[in-house]
Amino acid sequence: MTQMTVQVVTPDGIKYDHHAKFISVTTPDGEMGILPNHINVIAPLQVHEMKIRRVGEDDRVDWVAINGGIIEIKDNVVTIVADSAERDRDIDVSRAERAKLRAERDIAEAETTHDINEVQRAKVALRRALNRINVSKK
């Protein structure tokens, strides 16, 4: 069976490294499904839930919360360089819930002061927190 090596790398080190038969990521243009022997690509990534179907483990699916970055696909090696990333099993849900509440509070506060930059920053923080919460439930 043809397979790909999938690595997710952050400034903190390698967060994921396994062989896969399928992965799904989200770019600014939408969702992208990747199978072995995919054409070489470099693309930006959105904050999203990355789905990985592993090789040799019947229907084993791993989920990784990706918080932006880029993907490079070359010669059956998929490398994702992300600002931050967490596997579903590693997510501290209570910390993510606190981040969600903090971001919601920051959005409300920034909207009352009409601070557009702070609203945008808080919305990104909210998207990241919600992404982590959603991935933790997979």
From Swiss-Prot:
One of its GO terms (molecular function) is proton-transporting ATP synthase activity, rotational mechanism. Gene3D superfamilies: ATP synthase delta/epsilon subunit, C-terminal domain, F0F1 ATP synthase delta/epsilon subunit, N-terminal. Keywords: ATP synthesis, Cell membrane, CF(1), Hydrogen ion transport, Ion transport, Membrane, Transport. Pfam families: ATP-synt_DE, ATP-synt_DE_N. Disulfide bonds: none annotated. It is a peripheral membrane protein. GO terms for cellular component: plasma membrane; proton-transporting ATP synthase complex. F-type ATPases have 2 components, CF(1) - the catalytic core - and CF(0) - the membrane proton channel. CF(1) has five subunits: alpha(3), beta(3), gamma(1), delta(1), epsilon(1). CF(0) has three main subunits: a, b and c. PANTHER family: ATP SYNTHASE DELTA/EPSILON CHAIN, ATP SYNTHASE EPSILON CHAIN, CHLOROPLASTIC. HAMAP family: ATP_synth_epsil_bac. NCBIfam families: ATP_synt_epsi, PRK00571.1-3. Belongs to the ATPase epsilon chain family. This is ATP synthase epsilon chain. It comes from Streptococcus equi subsp. zooepidemicus (strain MGCS10565). The gene is atpC.
